[in-house]
């Protein structure tokens, strides 16, 4: 089964390039650990009306991997550098409904 985890929050830095650099460094550090736990994709989005509003959509092949990764203090420390406050994290499971 396929799972999606969304992470939505306000970026800490007002400078978008600084936020991107922090995000990309986080992915470089945490990405290999996530992939080893079943993370098969990561996409980052910014709200076009407020580019400090961030949304990540991560695709997983299991539910245990993201739960374990999100509980890791290393990821918490990275989130503290990236976000102004705690981001909202939501878990979704693929439905066996028609999709395209």
Give the label of every model feature segment.
Residues 77:
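Active-site phosphate/pyrophosphate- and oxyanion-stabilizing loops and adjacent acidic/basic residues
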Residues 1-71, 81, 85-100:
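Short S/T/G/P-rich N-terminal loop/turn motif that feeds into the first structured element of a domain
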